Amino acid sequence: MGVAGCDPGGAESPPAPIDPLDMGSDEDVGSGDMGPTPVELHGQLAVVGAELRDEHGERMQLKGPSSMWLNWENEGFAQNLEALRWMRNNWRATVIRAAMGVEPDGAYLTNPDKARSQVEQIVDNAIAAGVYVIIDWHDHNAHQHKDQAVQFFSEMATKYGDKPNVIYEPFNEPLDLDWQGTLKPYHEAVIAAIRAKDPDNVIVLGTPNWSQDVDRAAESPVAGTNLLYTLHFYACTHTDWLRGKADGARAKGLPLLVTEWGATHADGGTDGQVCLDAARLWHEWMNTHGIGWTAWKLDNCGQDSSCILAPNAPVTGGWTSTYLKGHGVFVRARMQDE
């Protein structure tokens, strides 16, 4: 099996075989219960310094997939409990991200009941499967929808605030907005609503410029406990310069979570390319610092190389290499890494 690659600058390179270490394993142990779940093992998460830790004080590196924008998720991969249990058992997934679209037609602003129901299905499944779950307000203009976000996260915290599985993500990818004057006040308002109902579950805060400018957030972090900051990368586009920003933020004590990444260009890989060499550098960096992640995206779309699944993938799991496409085998291998 081979893939076409590209250098970090985006130039195409000839197809090359995938390193076996980047393939992962097709071994299938099913979706049944197999001993302690991730949440049973690690319990309540907390942010200590620049690290996420479990209830035993050990560094916790979450790994799992992000859903597609749920308003465009036709197959229901992320909402299937058997598939989630299967990923937990076979890919060692410890987290899933529920990317609830906000602005597009049919998303939260125009169909809130459907959007909330989709998120709650994923959260309920995560609780049943014993994995962590990120409730993502998947919006580029959340500062314009602050009242709706405050209400939504207050409802989520009321319903799920006593569950250690839950992580809140109130702003997916802000545009190039002012941190101090716009984003920070937005986060403070949503945090206050969550903390009124849930005093301790982790909240991850979106950062300026498509959640890349973590260095700007590090200049004036939000006050509070158990707060992480979002970093997003797409390996063909974002290289050592973005890791430099992240290193600078971490040096100032800013704890990070990569809630979205791909071994593709930043457009999600519409050209079908993957950049595995560049992606490996990112994973070496995340592993060194214990930074957790969710990979974009658990979907079976056609051309985009950020789609993990092939068009013929079954909804309930059992995804051998035959059912993976784009960066899918690489994502699987990185989840299966010890």
Where are these regions (language model features)?
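Acidic active-site catalytic centers that drive phospho-/nucleotidyl reactions
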Residues: 54, 136, 260
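Surface-exposed charge patches
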Residues: 55, 86, 124, 247, ...
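Ser/Thr-rich, Pro/Gly/Ala-heavy low-complexity intrinsically disordered linkers and tails
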Residues: 1-37
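N-terminal carbohydrate-binding accessory modules
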Residues: 22-95, 318, 324, 329-337
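Substrate-binding cleft and catalytic face of glycoside hydrolase catalytic domains
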Residues: 74, 84-160, 164-176
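Cys/His-rich zinc-coordinating "finger/knuckle" motifs
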Residues: 12-14, 72, 167
